[in-house]
Amino acid sequence: MDNLGESPTDKGGEPGESEETRATPGALVAADTEGIPEETDRDGDADLKEAAAEESELKSQDVSDVTAAERENSSLLTPAAKKLKLDIKDKKEKKQKVDEDEIQKMQILVSSFSEEQLNRYEMYRRSAFPKAAIKRLIQSITGTSVSQNVVIAMSGISKVFVGEVVEEALDVCEKWGETPPLQPKHMREAVRRLKSKGQIPNSKHKKITFF
């Protein structure tokens, strides 16, 4: 009887315990499975943050290394670079100063011109030899084709040469007590004087004999 009385309670207790014991592993597994993703997410975020921090540190270190290398290179090249910059600056300043002086001198000279001299200057400044004629002349003498730069240079030299001959011819005309316009005799005398001064090369071929 005692055994029969105890058995229901024992049997009742055993099923309760078995249900609890059966339920608790599932609950534990569920709790574990629910907790694992949160921990992995947190760990992943921490890893990403650490990786980003390390990458930023590496970048900052690389930048500092590059800037240090640039500073070292600049310190090594500083004297030569400074000298080159100073030379270029001095040349620019000198050229600018020379240009300003030339402009000022030209302005003073032009302001002192008479009306006739001013007209002559304007005509000379605007005058130019036709480049096609200069090119044909050069090609007929040399027998070869020339570039446009050579034609421009020869045109400018020819203009300067003719200007010098005309100026010398005007001096001859004045010394002879004559008035312009210039005549062929004035031009011939001007060429003769320029040749005697060595300003015009002698076009006649002279045979040099050796003893």
From Swiss-Prot:
Q: What does this protein do?
A: The TFIID basal transcription factor complex plays a major role in the initiation of RNA polymerase II (Pol II)-dependent transcription. TFIID recognizes and binds promoters with or without a TATA box via its subunit TBP, a TATA-box-binding protein, and promotes assembly of the pre-initiation complex (PIC). The TFIID complex consists of TBP and TBP-associated factors (TAFs), including TAF1, TAF2, TAF3, TAF4, TAF5, TAF6, TAF7, TAF8, TAF9, TAF10, TAF11, TAF12 and TAF13.
Region listing for Disordered, in residue ranges = 1-74
Q: Basic and acidic residues bias: where?
A: 8-22, 43-73
Enumerate the InterPro entries for this protein: Histone-fold, TAF11-like, TAFII28_dom
- Asked if the record carries the keyword Acetylation, the reply is yes
Tell me the Pfam families matching this sequence.
Answer: TAFII28
- The protein's gene is named Taf11
Any one GO cellular component localisation term in the record: transcription factor TFIID complex
Entry domain remark: TBP and TAFII18 bind to distinct domains of TAFII28.
GO term, biological process aspect, one? RNA polymerase II preinitiation complex assembly
Report the GO molecular function annotations. Answer: DNA binding; protein heterodimerization activity
Please, which domain of life does this record's source organism belong to? Eukaryota
Specify the protein name: Transcription initiation factor TFIID subunit 11
User: Which UniProt key words apply to this protein?
Assistant: Acetylation, Nucleus, Transcription, Transcription regulation
Q: State the Gene3D superfamilies in the record.
A: Histone, subunit A
Assembly and interaction partners: Component of the TFIID basal transcription factor complex, composed of TATA-box-binding protein TBP, and a number of TBP-associated factors (TAFs), including TAF1, TAF2, TAF3, TAF4, TAF5, TAF6, TAF7, TAF8, TAF9, TAF10, TAF11, TAF12 and TAF13. Interacts with TAF13 both in vitro and intracellularly; also interacts directly with TBP.
**What family, per the record?**
Belongs to the TAF11 family.
Species this protein is from: Mus musculus (Mouse)
What positions are modified (N-acetylmethionine)?
A: M1
Annotated localization: Nucleus
Q: Does the keyword Nucleus apply?
A: yes
